[in-house]
Amino acid sequence: MIAVIGTRPQFIKHASLEMAARGKMDIESIHTGQHFDENMSSIFFDQLKINTPKYNLDSEGKTHGSQTASMLIGIEEILLDEKPDFVLVYGDSNTTLAGALSASKLNIPIVHVEAGLRSFNKNMPEEINRILTDHTADTLFCSSPEGIHNLSKEGIKNGVFLVGDIMKDLVLHYTSKDSKLDKLYNFDYYYATLHRPYNVDNKDRLMQIFDVLNTLDHKVVFAIHPRTKVNVGKYQIDLSKFENIHVIESQSYFKNLDHITESLAVITDSGGMQKESYWLLKKCVTIRSETEWTETLRHDANTLVFENLKDIQNVINLAPKKFDDSLYGYGNTGSQIVDTLINNYQKNLN
């Protein structure tokens, strides 16, 4: 099997799959290079103990169209040479779409992990990537019953499996370790990250968010994403003027989990952190108008705030009513995926 990866969330998902697949199936990977910051890429491979990708492409810093086209060309050449039994893609990035389209054009079976998600906002590039990938995939692994429902409404009913969320495997694996961490800071804090274009690619919008974070009743530890950092420089925003915001560099995966664990609440526009906050029993405020992770909105565990940014403080003060330990599975998603793929492959041979 060839797995196509290129973004931070995909490295996390692939680490879980590799752990589950050891001794059972052969996996090679293509790294498209979509994420290029050291903490967003190379350190992840060391920290997550992911095998070094057999192939590396250079797709950073391009527009959506040129980036996807560049990936398509590179992935197709590799697939023609490797002739894998199937190609596996994760999530909803340009890497996901490029991997799926490349395999589809070559009639190689496609496996989509995290299938069926819908935000119902087609202005999001990720939403288009999800839909197109699902409609080319042969085997679709869903994180929740809602994913299966969404696929069914679009006429996709065959090859669909409910397995839970593969990111939960790694979160539970890490937090199960019996180790007491030193306290990260000598103050209580909210943990914040931002990277979506609609939040960070406009100076006025970005300043509005910083202004509100600066008024919150506890300090905000702000892990600055590479995209956000570039824009802060471009817009000549002096972050030192926001005394309530403590800026740190983007964090490696486990450090990010540590920051969530010690925080009072999480403020983000990240998809993955909405789930990680839930699993780590932290209130999450999502600075978006919609989310594909609709289940987290239940019981006030996650709340969407987009237009009325001043609502963030009030939303944080609303304590979640309940956390469901079974949301998105029980931490064995990787094993379910591997076993299903092996069983289906053996059936096809017979």
Where are these regions (language model features)?
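Nucleotide-activated sugar donor-binding and catalytic core shared by glycosyltransferases
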Residues: 1-219, 228-350
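Conserved C-terminal portion of the radical SAM core fold
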Residues: 225
